[in-house]
Amino acid sequence: MSHGGGGHAAELFPEDQVLAFGAVLSLVGIYIAHFFPSLAMLLGGLLAAGACVAGANTTRRVAAYGLGTGVPSIGMVSLGMGTISALAGVLIPSAFGLPVLVTPILAAVIAVVVGFIVGKLTQNPVGMKVPIIVSSMTKLSLMGALAILGFCTAFAGGFSADIIINGAINNGVIALAFIAAGMAILHPFNACIGPDESHKRTMTLAVACGFMAWLVFAIAKLDIVSTAVAAIFWFIAYGTFVKTSLADACEVKYVPELPKKE
């Protein structure tokens, strides 16, 4: 049921489990990309998609309270908080002499703090009356940070400050991460929203969007193997989404080719 006209069906997968699954996968992927640069895009990019899926699931839950056009906006907010947190996690260790291996964990901790603060601000002074807005902003900030750091690390081949600055910031790749991961987090529920929305169908599209973000990065890096694997994974996931949509629809009408003349 929708909490506020948002079009939210019953949950098949508990949010906290999806969140934990996405966080663990993305963190593992970040460390794999750092320690094994040759596998950075293949495995790091794949596992970074887990953060996108978990973020899309949280977007679905909070947007069910009737955010309306706020569905895309909250996805962008997620990546805004995530970008700040990821950059802080990358730069603080080099500035204060901390071990570089704490970077992903530090970014995650900062993201949780930033998300909590932003969530509180949306209650007061903004005045949003969504009961789960604070916890949702916290989770979205975390997933945004892990997605940004995950894809940037996969592209650059590591998460130390010098590698990220030269391999993901100076060349503008972090902007690509912002858009690709942001779309993967906001689009699934925005596309499936409505009275006939189902958790399974929305999450299937979320997986497809996560794979598409990975595919975009694989193409940008000119990684042939990762591009081929990501394309196959995306094709399977999106094909499953289309089949699920056709099965759930009460009626399917195929639009003929537009007439060439009146």
Curated annotation (Swiss-Prot):
Segments crossing the lipid bilayer: 27-47, 72-92, 98-118, 145-165, 173-193, 200-220, 222-242
One GO cellular component term noted in the UniProt record for this chain: plasma membrane
Domain of life: Archaea
Name of this chain's protein: Tetrahydromethanopterin S-methyltransferase subunit C
Compartment(s): Cell membrane
Keywords of this entry: Cell membrane, Membrane, Methanogenesis, Methyltransferase, One-carbon metabolism, Transferase, Translocase, Transmembrane, Transmembrane helix
Gene name of the encoded protein: mtrC
One Gene Ontology MF term: tetrahydromethanopterin S-methyltransferase activity
Family: Belongs to the MtrC family.
Organismal lineage: Archaea, Methanobacteriati, Methanobacteriota, Methanomada group, Methanococci
Main enzyme class: translocase
InterPro entries membership: THM_MeTrfase_su_C (IPR005865)
Reactions catalysed, as given in the entry: 5-methyl-5,6,7,8-tetrahydromethanopterin + coenzyme M + 2 Na(+)(in) = 5,6,7,8-tetrahydromethanopterin + methyl-coenzyme M + 2 Na(+)(out)
Role noted for this protein: Part of a complex that catalyzes the formation of methyl-coenzyme M and tetrahydromethanopterin from coenzyme M and methyl-tetrahydromethanopterin. This is an energy-conserving, sodium-ion translocating step.
Subunit text: The complex is composed of 8 subunits; MtrA, MtrB, MtrC, MtrD, MtrE, MtrF, MtrG and MtrH.
Main location: membrane
Protein's UniProt keywords contain Zinc: no
Any single biological process term in GO: one-carbon metabolic process
Organism, scientific name: Methanococcus maripaludis (strain C5 / ATCC BAA-1333)
Membrane-topology annotation of the record: Multi-pass membrane protein
